[in-house]
Amino acid sequence: MADTFFFTPSRRLTVANVAELTGAKLLNPEFSNTVINTLSSLESAGKGSLVFVEHRKFSDALVGSSAVAVFCTNEIVFKVPESMAILVTSTPQRDFAQIGRILFPDSVKPMPWFGQREISPHAHIHPSAKLAGDVCIEAGAVIGRNVEIGSGSLIASTAVIGENCRIGCDCYIAPKVTVQYSLIGDKVHLYPGACIGQDGFGYIGGASGIEKVPQLGRVIIEDGVEIGANTTIDRGTFEDTIIGEGSKIDNLVQIAHNVKIGRYCLIAAQCGIAGSTSIGDMSQLGGSVGVADHIVIGKYVQIAAGSGVMNDIPDGEKWGGSPARPFKQWFREVAALRSIGKVKKEKR
């Protein structure tokens, strides 16, 4: 369950409140006044715990759980013990997350590391920087020449914002983040160690060896984007590197120069996207996907973890494997290899 040492509930909710807030249907109204004060997994649930079950394969864990209420679908209702309030919904996990944001708002809204929203006298801020009145700049942060930072944004200790960069409203720039040659939209979160706008990997062979190609573009990060810890996004050579609105990028991802990522994409940890590749809106990349340079990935594409993408992918397709190919082809080839191995083993 939620650790109350770090996360304290912000308010008191009853089961009836939860049903009203989410639109879930409460099947047993006698539980209307039951108090919910924390969120839990089925296994760790205790007094006052709210849980969710979205798939039947996890429903057996309801038996013996100490939770007082559960979000579930209609097909799971018959598995719920009589001791629990039943909140029926087609989206259990989404409704569970909504209540989590209400009960524990501090868990999704980064707070100042030193507890106060202020501009620290120990921050290093260039006199030409333009800061909105309610910006928080913590001790040890560095704000360069002509930087602009919008209202409600928090720049944490040891973050560095390079000259001429723009940071929008309600952004969170975590410790050890560096931002240079970049325009950042509103409600953007950059988590610890993220590096935005550094040189792209541009080199060319010359008479004296390997020579640097100047990187003269920018990084543009649109509204609502989240960039995970230690992720790196290189600025463009001439064209901009762009991360589209609402996209979420996990930890330890490398995005090379000139890459264009569409709106509301999900990119899991340890992916590497080579230069000048474009990824369409609403596409998803599993962990450790590698994408070659100058590839065009369409909208609504799903790519399995560990895949190596060497060719363009049309809209709406699901690919996997290395080199990546459509799921059906990939599964057939894997099945064929297994069959060959089985035949050889039998012949021995």
Swiss-Prot record:
Any one GO cellular component localisation term in the record: membrane
- How would you classify this enzyme at the top EC level? transferase
Pathway of action: Bacterial outer membrane biogenesis; LPS lipid A biosynthesis
Does the record bear Magnesium in its keywords? no
Any one GO molecular-function label of the UniProt entry: N-acyltransferase activity
The record's catalysed reaction(s) read: a UDP-3-O-[(3R)-3-hydroxyacyl]-alpha-D-glucosamine + a (3R)-hydroxyacyl-[ACP] = a UDP-2-N,3-O-bis[(3R)-3-hydroxyacyl]-alpha-D-glucosamine + holo-[ACP] + H(+)
Which Pfam families did the record assign?
Answer: Hexapep (PF00132), LpxD (PF04613)
Q: Could you tell me which SUPFAM superfamilies the record lists for this protein? A: Trimeric LpxA-like enzymes (SSF51161)
* Keyword Transmembrane helix in annotation: no
What are the protein's UniProt keywords? Acyltransferase, Lipid A biosynthesis, Lipid biosynthesis, Lipid metabolism, Repeat, Transferase
- Which residues catalyse the reaction? H257 (proton acceptor)
Q: Which BP terms from GO are recorded?
A: lipid A biosynthetic process
Segments spanning the bilayer are none
**Which InterPro entries would you find in this protein's record?**
Hexapep (IPR001451), Hexapep_transf_CS (IPR018357), LpxD (IPR007691), Trimer_LpxA-like_sf (IPR011004), UDP_GlcNAc_AcTrfase_non-rep (IPR020573)
* PROSITE patterns in the record: HEXAPEP_TRANSFERASES (PS00101)
EC number(s) of the enzyme? 2.3.1.191
The subunit structure is:
Homotrimer.
Membership in a protein family: Belongs to the transferase hexapeptide repeat family. LpxD subfamily.
This molecule's function is given as:
Catalyzes the N-acylation of UDP-3-O-acylglucosamine using 3-hydroxyacyl-ACP as the acyl donor. Is involved in the biosynthesis of lipid A, a phosphorylated glycolipid that anchors the lipopolysaccharide to the outer membrane of the cell.
Q: Which PANTHER family match?
A: UDP-3-O-ACYLGLUCOSAMINE N-ACYLTRANSFERASE (PTHR43378), UDP-3-O-ACYLGLUCOSAMINE N-ACYLTRANSFERASE 1, MITOCHONDRIAL-RELATED (PTHR43378:SF2)
Protein name, as recorded: UDP-3-O-acylglucosamine N-acyltransferase
This chain's source organism reads Bartonella henselae (strain ATCC 49882 / DSM 28221 / CCUG 30454 / Houston 1) (Rochalimaea henselae)
